[in-house]
Amino acid sequence: MSSTHWLMAWVGLELNTLAIIPIITKHHHPRSTEATTKYFLTQAAASTMLLFASTMNAWHTGTWDISQLTNQPACIMLTMALSMKLGLAPLHFWLPEVLQGTSLSTALIIATWQKLAPMALMFLTHNSLSPSTLLTMGMISALVGGWGGLNQTQTRKIMAFSSIAHLGWMVVAMTLNPRLALLNLTLYLLMTTTTFIMLMRTTSKTIKDLTTATTLSPPTTALMMTLLMSMGGLPPLTGFIPKWLILQELNDHNFPATALIMALSALLSLFFYLRLAYVSTLTAFPVTTNTAYKWRLIPKTSTLTMSLMLMASTLLLPITPMLL
């Protein structure tokens, strides 16, 4: 993240990949093995592409400095490599499958911490990357993330498509205002972490599991609805901040069509967030035996951290001017 040399940046990305692989495969299950293999092959291909792009640029410019990215083919290859590492559409196919094959805690790491290094490299090189390419990939990611999550029943896959959609918004913001993209990234990490913690607390791996979450912890389930609405970007919640500011930025830079597409894509995402909220808070499972089994799975975790993160994930809209 702090490197200015291409080789050191590549080494950092490789260490990041190799460190997460044992965490994914710690559960001895065929799905974990499959997820590990898919993750490793995808990340290795992206790292190879990044190394090739940096070597090509060094051959052309005579320097390994990250800021001296002037070779056009190298810029295109770097964009593809970082997009594959992040899971941006149309290079997103690995992300839902990998998250589905892992535990909720590991999925949290992949959806949050593992995004930091590629995003840092994208921040460092955004001036050299093609704005039209980034805008296009951002719009496609927002649409694919919203569209792909509509027919899912597994919460991990829904969170994967949610991640793809949020990354699309971040990339669009980065072409216009990197500081706004950084704010979007921070709020995304905050809201996604809180959502995963609540899913872990209610042990909800499927939408069906959410129907019995109320009996486990009524306050948690009630607050989960507010959190999901924040993830969908409804005012007056925290998640409305990045969408509002990005649409305003697009309008200020004369991109009304892009702003319209991004706003419509947010409706797709909002639909499956509403679906989760409806199932978790407004429905009750008719069979009591499933409810009884649910009580045996209460995780022994502290609620203080979750409460503080939940407050930040829902109540930051009034202090928007301080965040800019």
For each feature predicted by the language model, list its residue ranges.
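Core, highly hydrophobic multi-pass alpha-helical transmembrane subunits of bioenergetic inner membranes
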Residues: 1-324
